[in-house]
Amino acid sequence: MEESGYESVLCVKPDVHVYRIPPRATNRGYRAAEWQLDQPSWSGRLRITAKGQMAYIKLEDRTSGELFAQAPVDQFPGTAVESVTDSSRYFVIRIEDGNGRRAFIGIGFGDRGDAFDFNVALQDHFKWVKQQCEFAKQAQNPDQGPKLDLGFKEGQTIKLNIANMKKKEGAAGNPRVRPASTGGLSLLPPPPGGKTSTLIPPPGEQLAVGGSLVQPAVAPSSGGAPVPWPQPNPATADIWGDFTKSTGSTSSQTQPGTGWVQF
């Protein structure tokens, strides 16, 4: 995988101490108790950066940011960064200069939380590097990836509960019948004890009572009891008399030969 052209910052710790460590005589791990912990060789700021697959541990001055030492890390855990066996706050890192010279120094943090963040930052970076390498391999050889086998193995069976399936289908096929709507607006009954008001026609209008047109009696304006309605005339009376008279007078005024029938 090609290295990217920009550098990202993974972790910054403002307080770190550097120690000179004695050479390791055996294959056993480093011990911080063998260092002069009360007399650090240098104190400053630690910064972890990443560029592509590589990570860099940089020891810088707190005020000016001048680089004191740098440790390139190509894998973690590895020889570039090692933990001591007797404490979780101290590590041994391998620093390099521009001329290819290398040296091992000890670093320590005053707070265990800072040491934990230092460790996790390196772990997360190289976990990401591993994932990127796997993705690149899968992109080059997509057929070599694991295939999903959904077939039945020899002798493998499955059980289907058809009874429950039929019940569900029956329940879904019989929707609830909604009551038919009567349509229109429902009229409320009149209030109890109410009286139906009698409509009195305006003066000058005629009402058909018992088959004849009568003129309603008008009560005098002075007030008093209402005048009773007159008795209906016999049914033999011609109820269309006034109507035929009015239509006859109208038809007499109509010019003959127009082709229209008057009603």
From Swiss-Prot:
Motif WXXF motif 1: positions: 240-243
GO cellular component labels: clathrin vesicle coat; clathrin-coated pit; plasma membrane
Location of the motif WXXF motif 2: 260-263
Key words, A-Z: Cell membrane, Cytoplasmic vesicle, Endocytosis, Membrane, Phosphoprotein, Protein transport, Repeat, Transport
Transmembrane segments: none
Subcellular location: Cytoplasmic vesicle, Clathrin-coated vesicle membrane; Cell membrane
InterPro entries tied to this protein: NECAP_PHear, PH-like_dom_sf
Disulphide-bonded residues: none
Pfam families found in the cross-reference section: DUF1681
Bias type Low complexity, positions: 246-263
GO terms (BP aspect): endocytosis; protein transport; vesicle-mediated transport
Residue numbers of Phosphoserine PTMs: 181
Start and end residues of each stretch annotated as Disordered: 166-194, 219-263
Keyword set includes Endoplasmic reticulum: no
Primary localization: membrane
Domain of life according to the entry: Eukaryota
Family per record: Belongs to the NECAP family.
Complex formation: Interacts with AP1G1 and AP2A1 components of the adapter protein complexes AP-1 and AP-2. Interacts with the GAE domain proteins GGA1, GGA2 and GGA3.
Role: Involved in endocytosis.
Record comment regarding domains: The WXXF motifs mediate binding of accessory proteins to the ear-domain of AP-1, GGAs and AP-2 through hydrophobic interactions. Selective binding to the GAE domains of AP-1 or to the alpha-ear domain of AP-2 is tuned by the acidic context surrounding the motif and the properties of the second residue of the motif itself.
PANTHER family in the cross-refs: ADAPTIN EAR-BINDING COAT-ASSOCIATED PROTEIN 2, ATP-BINDING CASSETTE ABC TRANSPORTER-RELATED
Protein name (record): Adaptin ear-binding coat-associated protein 2
Source organism (scientific name): Homo sapiens (Human)
Gene behind this protein: NECAP2
